[in-house]
Amino acid sequence: MKEIQIPRKSFARSSELGAKRLKDPEMKNRKVTTEKRQIATFSDVSFESTKDPMDFSPISQISGAISDSEAESVIQGSSLDLMSTPEICLPADDSPVSTITSVEARIDTSSTDRIQSIVDLPASVQSLRGEINELKKLICSVDNSAEINWVDRVVTVKFRIVLLSFILWAILAAIVVFFSSGEERAYRGPLPT
């Protein structure tokens, strides 16, 4: 018996396809165009980044220089200094526009009340959560005990009815099978063909 050989199709390898793509002049033009766009974009970004020099020192060096107690004392001292200082300078630049001079540098009492309420917020939230949990327990204990008793009674009665129905059906089926199996009747009806 002679085997029939099916000619296999030769598939081009991926490297050959890449070479064909590069030989295509339209593809070359697209590649050159995209490279030009990328170079223009990245040169704009690099120009902007050199325009604004910034201090990029690691956070660990900055945070290591100031301890927690020093930071707290600076924060507390700065709030007192703000009330007594008539002149406030912004650190961005030393132009006359950035310097604010005012004799009436006051802190509104409502803002200090807001700050105090923000400080006391976690304690009040915890106390509210505790009260809510106690109320939930009280309400659930009253409602659940009455509701659970009612549900238990309904389920128990339903289970008893289903069980009684099943037992009666089993007894009736047993009686029918018991009495009908012993009799032999003569066949009455059309004869089989």
From Swiss-Prot:
Q: Where in the cell is it found?
A: Nucleus membrane
List UniProt keywords, sorted A-Z: Membrane, Nucleus, Transmembrane, Transmembrane helix
Question: Motif Required for nuclear localization: residue span?
Answer: 190-193
Keyword check for S-adenosyl-L-methionine, yes or no: no
Q: Name one GO cellular component term.
A: nuclear envelope
The portions of this protein that span the membrane are 161-181
- Give the way it sits in the membrane: Single-pass membrane protein
Q: Where is the composition biased (Basic and acidic residues)?
A: 18-35
Domain (KASH) spans 155-193
Question: Where does the record place the region Disordered?
Answer: 15-35
Highest taxon of the lineage: Eukaryota
Quaternary structure annotation from Swiss-Prot or TrEMBL: Interacts with SUN1 and SUN2.
Quote the record's domain comment. Answer: The KASH domain, which contains a transmembrane domain, mediates the nuclear envelope targeting and is involved in the binding to the SUN proteins.
What is the protein's name according to its record? Protein SINE3
* Species in which this protein is naturally found: Arabidopsis thaliana (Mouse-ear cress)
Q: Which gene encodes it?
A: SINE3
